């Protein structure tokens, strides 16, 4: 037998994909069992950059498979003047994650996941009625909408905090995520969530 036949095949190891080359997804825990299918953060969804150019709006529920950091990045591209500037928002998120790591010493992905879990309202009120009589009725919120609303509230809070402020939007996003992770009332998202749940409770 020649040495070619006896040689053991080299096993190509898959490289460990880290977000921005720094943050690993392996140790990220999703403590809320109802949101585990809707927060895409596991190895399967790992990306070097939060930009996959996927067609997530093609089907309902497809966006649940969009990596959660990419959903945050896309949500930061709001208000006309920032529409389509994804490179700018990727840079903002990267900077915010570095600030979070400096302030907390934790994996920023874990901080983001915890902030989303804490910021999603569990109960909301909807309008029910016909022929002129409208009343509000408390309803449970689906897991996907909880994630959608949490991301929207976190981004809105960061955007409003940075407006006419000396702090950069990356610093405001980092503060918002850290406060939401703690459940602090300094967070815009937590305040809004509590308000929505309070209104829903009064409409039960």
UniProtKB/Swiss-Prot annotation:
Keyword Ribonucleoprotein: yes
Alphabetical list of PROSITE patterns matching this protein: RIBOSOMAL_S7
Record SUPFAM superfamilies: Ribosomal protein S7
Top-rank taxon, per record: Eukaryota
Cross-link (Glycyl lysine isopeptide (Lys-Gly) (interchain with G-Cter in SUMO2)): 47
GO cellular component, one term: cytosolic ribosome
Annotated compartments: Cytoplasm; Nucleus, Nucleolus
Modified residues (Phosphothreonine): 14
A Gene Ontology molecular function term of the record: mRNA binding
Modified-residue entries (N-acetylmethionine), positions: 1
Keyword Ribosomal protein: yes
GO biological process, one term: regulation of translational fidelity
Entry-annotated residues carrying N6-acetyllysine: 47
Residue positions, PTM Phosphoserine: 142
Residue positions, PTM N-acetylthreonine: 2
Role of this protein: Component of the small ribosomal subunit. The ribosome is a large ribonucleoprotein complex responsible for the synthesis of proteins in the cell. Part of the small subunit (SSU) processome, first precursor of the small eukaryotic ribosomal subunit. During the assembly of the SSU processome in the nucleolus, many ribosome biogenesis factors, an RNA chaperone and ribosomal proteins associate with the nascent pre-rRNA and work in concert to generate RNA folding, modifications, rearrangements and cleavage as well as targeted degradation of pre-ribosomal RNA by the RNA exosome.
NCBIfam families: PRK04027.1, uS7_euk_arch
Oligomer and partners: Component of the small ribosomal subunit. Part of the small subunit (SSU) processome, composed of more than 70 proteins and the RNA chaperone small nucleolar RNA (snoRNA) U3.
Alphabetical list of PANTHER family matching this protein: RIBOSOMAL PROTEIN S7
The protein, known as: Small ribosomal subunit protein uS7
Organism per entry: Rattus norvegicus (Rat)
Name of the gene this protein is made from: Rps5
């Amino acid at each position: 037998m020649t040495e070619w036949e006896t040689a053991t095949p080299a096993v190509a190891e898959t490289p460990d994909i880290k977000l921005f080359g720094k943050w690993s997804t392996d140790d990220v825990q999703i403590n809320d069992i109802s949101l585990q299918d809707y927060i895409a953060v596991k190895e399967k969804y790992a990306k070097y950059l939060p930009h996959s150019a996927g067609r997530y709006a093609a089907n309902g529920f497809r966006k649940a498979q969009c990596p959660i950091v990419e959903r945050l990045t896309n949500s930061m591209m709001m208000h006309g003047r920032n529409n389509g500037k994804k490179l700018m928002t990727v840079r903002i998120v990267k900077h915010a994650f570095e600030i979070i790591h400096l302030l907390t010493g934790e994996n920023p992905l874990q901080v983001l996941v915890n902030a989303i879990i804490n910021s999603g309202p569990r109960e909301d009120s909807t309008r029910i009625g016909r022929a002129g009589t409208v009343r509000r009725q408390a309803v449970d919120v689906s897991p996907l909408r909880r994630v959608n609303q949490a991301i929207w509230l976190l981004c809105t809070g960061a955007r409003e905090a940075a407006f006419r402020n000396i702090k950069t939007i990356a610093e405001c996003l980092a503060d918002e995520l850290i406060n939401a992770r703690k459940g602090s009332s300094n967070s815009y998202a937590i305040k809004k969530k509590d308000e929505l749940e309070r209104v829903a409770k009064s409409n039960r």
